[in-house]
Structure formats: structure tokens, C-alpha cells
Amino acid sequence: RQMCIRDRFTDVENFRKKIDSSYKSNRTKRKPCGFKRLLNWAKTEFECIRMPQLEADDVLGILSTSGCYTNFVLVSPDKDMEQIPCRIYNLKEEFTQTPEQAEYKLYEQCLSGDPVDGYSGIKGIGKKKAQSILNNKEGTYWDTVLKAFKDHGYKEADALKQLRLAKILHSDNWDYARERPILFTP
């Protein structure tokens, strides 16, 4: 069974824009010629899923952790998919992302930010520095991340905001009855 879940299936309303109105505001590039036609073709050939207020990444995270699907491979070159504990093919290699590795990736992205998605993390901290901080953690990852934010002059609210912007939702972050996200709290 094949499914097509693509950014253009992202809902018009995005819950992250309620957390930070500048989220993804840096994206102004137009889609390539023929993109809409390709998208319409995909909608006729594959099962396509859209969920209210969510990006395609979140839909993948929720479906992949819901228990409804087994023996699948998530195919995407997007590094954000590494927050999802499942089998992944990133167009270079296939690997299994454990829950522990997925959690680590979330906190790494919280520290380093993601300029493509438009959230900053801690200014001056990139992937390598974020990994160094996490590899020397004391307590939980959240404790370590919170300390790093405070050490750089930020408040707890800043750290939580970055974490919620970074977090790819899993099934336990989705209110199925009300069809809305449950904001992640560490």
C-alpha cells in the first residue's frame, strides 16, 4: 500500500504559526512549473491524507506512531523525519530510528534551530555544538536543553517555544476527537 503525503497536502492553517507568527515566513520561492499538475495526478493515483492544522511532516509522524501501520518504510530526504521512530529511507540509506534516537534528534534541532523552517534555536549553536551539549547531558534532555538556553540568556518560555516549533508530532500529540494538536510538553 502506498500513500502520498506531501507538503502541498499541508493544511492552510498551521498550528505552529499560532506559536510563532514568523514560522516559515522566509519561504517565498514559487513551486516549479507543472507542480500543480503532478500534485493532482498524485491525488488520483495514491491515498492522500490531510489533517487539520498540520504539516505533512506531522501527518507522517502521527500515522507512523499510531500503530495502524506495520512493516513500512518512511521515504523522505527531510532530516525532520529522524524525529519519528520507524524505518526510514532518506534517499541515501535505509535505517531504523529508535525512540531514543528520535528524541535526541528533536532536542538537537531545538538547540540548533532550522533556518529553512524559520526557527532559530540558540544563536551560535549549530548541529555539532548541539550534539556536544546533548552528549554531555545531566538529567533529561529537556533539563540539558533548558540549561543551555538559560546559559545563553534565554528564558524557559523561549526554550519551550523552540521545542514546540521543532517537534514533529506523534500519535500521542494529536487529539483525535477534536482533530487538533496537543502541544508538546517535556
Cite the ranges covered by each PLM segment:
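Short, small-residue-biased leader/transition segments that mark boundaries at the very start
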Residues: 1-5
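Short loop/turn segments at strand-loop or loop-helix junctions that form parts
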Residues: 7-13, 18-19
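Contiguous, small/hydrophobic- and glycine-enriched helical/loop subdomains that border
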Residues: 22
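Extended two-metal-dependent nuclease catalytic cores across DNA- and RNA-processing enzymes
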Residues: 25-186
